[in-house]
């Protein structure tokens, strides 16, 4: 973030985050073919990596207090229109009703494990889904450094 801000001092930085437990379970249960994501196939590594990320984003938020827009995934899916309007305002962009129709506007292919989700309307079923695993993963959840 420091590098980006140095070369693009007027840039807008958006940090989208979600519930730590949901994030951890999602990372672990999805297969990522990239060698850069090898750590996500091990719960201990996933917790360590998440905690490094959490520390790093806290550092950058302290360095650039008003420069980073922190967008909660849970808030985005529960109040999409209002949250998207806030995000657009931060980016100095105008509201367009198509912002809520993203799933109908694909013109280019996307390569992500979330391909099917990206082509659906915004949905809430992934919020707090980690509770289904809490009995089995409590020791890992307890080690997560929450962002909020």
Residue ranges with predicted function:
Residues 1:
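Conserved adenosine/adenylate-binding substructure
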Residues 4, 8-29:
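Conserved phosphate-donor/acceptor-positioning beta-strand/loop module used by diverse small-molecule
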Residues 7, 27-70, 77-148:
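PAPS-dependent sulfotransferases, especially Golgi type II membrane carbohydrate sulfotransferases
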Residues 15, 70-72:
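Structural signal for conserved beta-strand scaffold positions within catalytic alpha/beta enzyme cores
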Residues 20-21, 75-78:
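Short, glycine-/Ser/Thr-/acidic-enriched flexible segments
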């Amino acid at each position: 973030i420091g590098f980006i801000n140095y070369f693009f001092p007027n840039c807008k930085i958006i940090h989208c985050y979600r519930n730590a437990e949901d994030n951890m379970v999602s990372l672990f249960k999805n297969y990522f073919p990239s060698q850069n994501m090898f750590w996500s196939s091990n719960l201990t590594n996933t917790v360590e990596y998440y905690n490094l990320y959490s520390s790093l984003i806290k550092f950058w938020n302290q360095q650039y207090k008003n420069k980073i827009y922190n967008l909660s995934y849970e808030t985005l899916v529960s109040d999409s229109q209002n949250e998207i309007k806030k995000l657009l305002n931060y980016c100095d962009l105008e509201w367009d009703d198509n912002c809520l129709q993203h799933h109908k506007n694909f013109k280019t292919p996307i390569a992500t494990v979330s391909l099917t989700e990206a082509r659906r309307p915004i949905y809430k079923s992934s919020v707090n889904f980690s509770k289904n695993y809490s009995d089995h993963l409590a020791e890992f959840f307890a080690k997560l450094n929450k962002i909020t």
